[in-house]
């Protein structure tokens, strides 16, 4: 499993070809300081579910739901949704029975596929009913999460009106935004009422990327205790651009725009598949500032797709490029710590298969002296990446944000279809660094 973080299985891509392209992340079941991180792939489809509706889609709003809210649980292989039945096929083809795995010490030749579906969660979990009962005590630790995931996926495709995705537009001039947590953010941004935990899970999974960025940069950031003195200096510089003095145009009404802030999203995967209009929720937090988002990394675009730049409006520009960052870096030229910021979402810097590949990119980013914020999918993942950066670049950076749990992590679990015992919530933790600055001192003896 160690090589699966960056792997995109061709068979899975074919089976789910009707969905948006897949993005992977590593996942584990339980955060633990002493456990070994288990690396797996995670399919994530966003565009097909959350793309904005066009004028020709009005008819879909009056269709009767496929599933009612009291009929969301189905065994995967018997689901009325073809895509979910495909998941059962993938699990049976690529998964293994955990009891067989334990009995045969990981010898795949002796293990059987999970054909028996748990009656409580609906997922194929064991090779037979006998092994299901034998391993039920261990399975019960994840069964509730799997059932929740089963119902969430059916709900997304149930055909009901998804009121929770009717996101608010620009914030009123005199209406303050509070970034304490998801609940307070939704309330102060006038989101539709979240009537259930399921609504919260759906929306948080979609918005965890733009709002994680916004929560770090916003003046009401919840990370005041974790920000270091060097971090205060970096954020003060950035916020001097994001929060300028209110200057109006000649018409006396329109606020003048600030300089453009560049966000470099290195190793981009799931975040690069978000429909562009979702990033408006970041833009609305800083109404005077244009953003240019650079999605950079080998998984940003499908193979053989040429890099390109597109615009949503005059305040949101997107560039997509499959280059490694240390190659892309040379295209930029100069950098400004006031206007350039790095974000790395669960990059796997400390993973053995990717550590060497990350070294030159991290070094180039540190050379710019611009702020860099990094997330991880659990505590162990965060600590693994921190350890790798400290060992490889320890003399070259200052801490700006100490590792902490992300207030805007995804509340929805992502499940590894190759090993159902592994699940995570995206962007569980966050930390930040910046290239070390050296103070210039004056030696009076030289006078």
Predicted feature residues:
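Short cysteine-rich clusters marking metal-coordination/redox-active sites
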Residues: 97-100, 118
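Cys/His-coordinated zinc-finger cores
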Residues: 120-142
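Domain-level detector for long C-terminal conserved domains
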Residues: 297, 302-447
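Short, flexible, mixed-charge glycine/proline-rich loop motifs
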Residues: 84-93, 108-112
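N-terminal mitochondrial targeting presequence
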Residues: 1-60
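Short Cys/His-rich "knuckle" micro-motifs
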Residues: 107-112, 129-131, 135, 151-154
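Positively charged, amphipathic N-terminal segments that serve as targeting/anchoring signals
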Residues: 68-70, 91-94, 137-341, 345-353
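N-terminal alpha-helical interaction blocks
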Residues: 40-87
């Amino acid at each position: 499993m160690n090589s699966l973080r960056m792997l995109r299985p061709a068979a899975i891509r074919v089976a789910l070809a009707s969905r948006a392209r897949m993005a992977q992340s590593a996942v584990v079941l339980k955060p633990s300081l002493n456990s070994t991180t288990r690396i797996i792939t995670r399919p994530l489809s966003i565009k097909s579910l959350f793309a904005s509706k066009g004028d020709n889609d009005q008819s879909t709003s009056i269709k009767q739901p496929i599933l009612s809210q009291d009929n969301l649980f189905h065994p995967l292989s018997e689901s009325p949704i073809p895509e979910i039945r495909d998941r059962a096929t993938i699990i049976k083809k690529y998964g293994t029975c955990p009891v067989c795995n334990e009995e045969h010490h990981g010898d795949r030749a002796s293990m059987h596929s999970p054909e028996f579906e748990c009656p409580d969660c609906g997922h194929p979990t064991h090779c037979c009913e006998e092994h299901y009962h034998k391993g039920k005590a261990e399975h019960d630790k994840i069964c509730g999460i799997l059932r929740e995931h089963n119902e969430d996926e059916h709900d997304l495709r149930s055909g009901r009106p998804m009121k929770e995705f009717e996101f608010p537009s620009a914030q009123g001039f005199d209406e303050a935004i509070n970034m304490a947590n998801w609940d307070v953010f939704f309330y102060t941004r006038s989101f539709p009422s979240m009537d259930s935990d399921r609504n919260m899970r759906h929306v948080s999974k979609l918005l965890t990327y733009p709002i994680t960025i916004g929560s770090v940069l916003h003046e009401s950031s919840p990370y005041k205790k974790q920000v270091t003195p060097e971090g205060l200096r970096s954020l003060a510089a950035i916020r001097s651009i994001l929060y300028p003095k209110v200057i109006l145009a000649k018409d006396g009404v329109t606020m003048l725009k600030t300089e453009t802030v560049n966000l470099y999203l290195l190793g981009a995967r799931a975040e690069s598949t978000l429909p562009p209009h979702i990033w408006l929720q970041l833009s609305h937090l800083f109404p005077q500032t244009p953003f240019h988002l650079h999605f950079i990394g080998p998984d940003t675009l499908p193979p053989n797709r040429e890099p390109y730049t597109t615009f949503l409006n005059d305040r949101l520009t997107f560039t997509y490029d499959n280059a490694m960052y240390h190659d892309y870096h040379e295209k930029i030229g100069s950098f400004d710590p006031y206007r350039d910021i790095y974000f790395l979402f669960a990059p796997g810097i400390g993973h053995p298969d990717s550590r060497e590949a990350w070294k030159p990119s991290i070094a180039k980013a540190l050379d710019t002296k611009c702020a860099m914020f990094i997330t991880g999918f659990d505590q162990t993942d965060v600590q693994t990446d921190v350890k790798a950066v400290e060992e490889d670049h320890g003399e070259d950076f200052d801490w700006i944000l100490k590792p902490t749990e992300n207030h805007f992590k995804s509340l929805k679990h992502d499940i590894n279809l190759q090993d159902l015992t592994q699940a995570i919530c995206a962007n569980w933790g966050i930390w930040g660094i910046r290239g070390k600055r050296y103070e210039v001192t004056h030696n009076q003896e030289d006078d």
